[in-house]
A protein has these predicted regions:
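Glycine-rich, proline-tolerant flexible connector loops at the mouths of alpha/beta enzymes
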Residues: 26-54
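Conserved anion-binding
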Residues: 76, 88-144
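Glycine-enriched alpha-helix->loop->beta-strand junction motifs that scaffold or abut catalytic
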Residues: 33-37, 83-88, 108-109
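Hydrophobic faces of well-ordered beta-strands that scaffold small-molecule active sites
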Residues: 14-19, 38-40, 66-70, 89-91, ...
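Alpha-helix-loop-beta-strand connector modules within alpha/beta enzyme cores
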Residues: 49-83, 105-113, 137-140
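N-terminal amphipathic alpha-helix/helix-capping segment at the start of soluble metabolic enzymes
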Residues: 1-16, 128-142
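Short, acidic/polar
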Residues: 19-33, 72-80
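Conserved, mostly hydrophobic/aromatic
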Residues: 17, 30, 41, 81, ...
Length: 144
């Protein structure tokens, strides 16, 4: 199945669901209800990294991509979210071009951005994906 970014670029109408409270069952219900993606709110919602990791893993079991709303474009949070396998991030409070550029830099691998590179995460299939293939896939498919 094409990535969420590829589907959006192709003009496909996509329908997602917003999740603000941590609940594995809700993630699975949204996935089996045929939503195109799940948006997990880590700015206003109480989800921590452990809960987020579980939410992303459950969504992936059902081939449903996850976008995570991060607070203030926090570079460290963006790295952790994407390393857990979220296909994209949504960042509020971007007021300037420089804010947007910093967000893209945090989310994307070089040469587009400056995201740290680690293939031993969930996003890298725990080291089983060739590093060049990993980098290329995420450069092409990360949604910001």
């Amino acid at each position: 199945m094409p990535s969420l970014r590829a589907r959006a670029r192709a003009g496909e109408k996509l329908i997602g669901a917003l999740l603000r409270m941590p609940s594995e069952e809700l993630v699975e219900m949204l996935a089996v209800a045929a939503f195109d993606f799940v948006l997990i709110d880590c700015e206003h919602g109480p989800a921590d990294l452990v809960a987020l990791r579980q939410h992303i893993a459950l969504a992936q079991v059902h081939d449903v991509p996850v976008i995570v709303r991060v607070g203030e474009g926090d570079r460290d949070q963006i790295l952790r979210v994407l390393d857990q396998g979220a296909e994209g991030i949504l960042a509020p409070h971007l007021d300037t071009t420089a804010d947007a550029e910093a967000l893209v830099a945090a989310a994307m691998y070089p040469p587009v951005g400056s995201r740290g590179f680690a293939t031993y995460s969930r996003a890298g299939r725990f080291g089983l994906v060739d590093p060049a293939d990993h980098r290329e896939w995420w450069l092409e498919n990360t949604l910001v």
